[in-house]
């Protein structure tokens, strides 16, 4: 579908985008999209590393300790601050 797009079609699409959003908003939108992509990439990497670190389920441990808190840090240049997040527990009420 996208393999048939030539230079005139791509230029037309870019002109329409500039007309819709305005030249002033495009850098902010690109910056926001870049931040979102970085966050998504770091979360996917964290999930992948958590999956590799996990061990097969064994007998339940009787000396349960509360799960360690993990801090999610903001992307560089982001105005939000870091906040602690508690990990979900694997226990369910039965």
UniProtKB/Swiss-Prot annotation:
GO CC list: TAT protein transport complex
Description of how the protein assembles with itself and partners: The Tat system comprises two distinct complexes: a TatABC complex, containing multiple copies of TatA, TatB and TatC subunits, and a separate TatA complex, containing only TatA subunits. Substrates initially bind to the TatABC complex, which probably triggers association of the separate TatA complex to form the active translocon.
Protein name in UniProt: Sec-independent protein translocase protein TatA
One BP term from GO: protein transport by the Tat complex
Pfam family, one: TatA_B_E
UniProt source species: Streptomyces avermitilis (strain ATCC 31267 / DSM 46492 / JCM 5070 / NBRC 14893 / NCIMB 12804 / NRRL 8165 / MA-4680)
Subcellular localization: Cell membrane
Membrane spanning residue stretches: 1-21
InterPro entries for the chain: TatA/B/E (IPR003369), TatA/E (IPR006312)
The UniProt record lists the keyword Nuclease: no
GO molecular function per UniProt: protein transmembrane transporter activity
């Amino acid at each position: 579908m996208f393999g048939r797009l030539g230079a005139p079609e791509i230029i037309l699409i870019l002109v329409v985008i500039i007309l819709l959003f305005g030249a002033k908003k495009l850098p902010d939108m690109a910056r926001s999209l870049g931040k979102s992509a970085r966050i998504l990439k770091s979360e996917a990497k964290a999930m992948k590393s958590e999956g590799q670190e996990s061990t097969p389920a064994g007998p339940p441990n009787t000396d349960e300790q509360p799960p360690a808190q993990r801090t999610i840090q903001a992307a560089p240049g982001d105005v939000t601050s870091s906040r602690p997040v508690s990990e979900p527990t694997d226990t369910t009420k039965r």
